[in-house]
Amino acid sequence: MTREVHEDSSVTQLASRAFRWSFFNTVASRLGPLFIGIALARLLGPEQFGVFAIATVTLMAVLSFNELGVSLAIIRWRDDPASIAPTTNTISVLSSALLTAAVVIGAPWISTALGDVQATPVVQVMALSIVINGLVATPAAILQREFMQKQRTIADQVKTWLGAGISLTLALFGWGAMSLAIGHLVASVVFAVMLLRWSPLPYRFGWNRAILGKLFRFGIPLALSSIVLCASGYADQMIVGSVLGAHALGLYVLAFNLASWPVSIFSHPLRAVAPAAFSALKDDPPRMSRNFSRVLALLSCVAVPVCLALSGAAEPVVGFVYGDAWQASADVLLWLAALAALRIWFELAYDYLVVIGKSGSVLVIQACSFAVSLPVMLLAVHPFGEAGVAAAQFAVSLAVVLPLYAISLHRSGVRISDSAKAVAIPVGTAILVWPAAWAFAQFIAIPFLAAAAAGLLAAAVIGALVYRLRDDVKALRLSGRAKGVT
């Protein structure tokens, strides 16, 4: 018993330390480049921003399955990961190289289908990142497995700042959307070199037929799920670009990026360590379930008020940060910021289900989401434009995806009643934040003051909610230090 408690304490310490590094990494990666991103948006305008968005959508779609899901097996592998790393390297690089060639050749067709054939060279440059990603998929998974978030933080910071600096410099010289593509590619190369340097395992290729079946049984369902997840996540941008053109896509993507801030700040650091932390507790399902509800409660206290404040104050936020040229994106941000709160919940549930081996359930959920949202968005895009597409996404997520995740979690041993209680007060309080933020937007004429008022209100609500759960916060902080009972 003592041994189990000490092992759990060790895992908690590692996960806690990794989460702190991951959270710092995310905040630093976002706050600095935020200002560079604002400058780039003002320099490029919606049209060029939309051209780059076409290339980004293409890249993200391919990266969702480029290594066939096998690198994530590294995290779950109970034995020494060195036994499967050479094989996962081979699979990742071969599949990524083939996909890179396919995208480069098919770039003109892809660009035309997504709204602007002028995006072709940008798509081709961005496609080179696919093979780079495949090259370091296994080292990245190993760093995550070993909670080496300090090294990952440094690599991410170099990638972020280097890419942003190159992009801004080229944009000032009139390179347009290509400036963003080149900055991304150069930074990806440097990032890959750093991960290869810091990986605890030497980089080797190999082919072990004895483990191929096990790898593919785990990876293929996860890759298929990621494809459906990507299709579901980017179908809105594909529809906006193909139907309304690059200018409308630029407006939509700007709103999407703004709405993704709460997801990036609060969810992504957790996702960097949650799979490994959950995996370490797989032999104790009740503890996993309790930890899930506890993390969900704390995450909701912080993230939901921010998302709804951003939604209510969308107009002054866009006007102050990006200027009048981007004001039309406020109608999109209103819906996507509210959707961000649901996305944070979904990502936590996704990681939990994957760790316990329910990747098939995740695939079903994402397939249902895609099947329902696609026709709804297609019906909404013509009469209501890009804002209608955003509203359709929110409606489907609330009415279809949320219940499906709840059912899957219940079948996996999570007490949904506990989870519902965990989010009831944060959600109920945050719902009151939205009309207050909207009122600030309507009655305060100066955009900066309206946005600041909404932000201060959200901060006050977060403080009150977190204070209410201060015992849980203290328990999480101290659990890693516990020597007797965790």
Map each language-model feature to its residues.
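Alpha-helical transmembrane segments of multi-pass membrane transport and lipid-handling proteins
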Residues: M1-E4, V27, T90-G115, P121-V125, ...
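N-terminal membrane topogenesis motif
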Residues: M1-L34, I75, D79-T90, V117-A119, ...
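Membrane-interface junctions at transmembrane-helix termini in multi-pass inner-membrane proteins
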Residues: S16, A73-A82, I132-V158, F173, ...
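Membrane-interface helix-loop junctions in multi-pass transport and translocation proteins
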Residues: A39-T56, P108, T112, T120-P121, ...
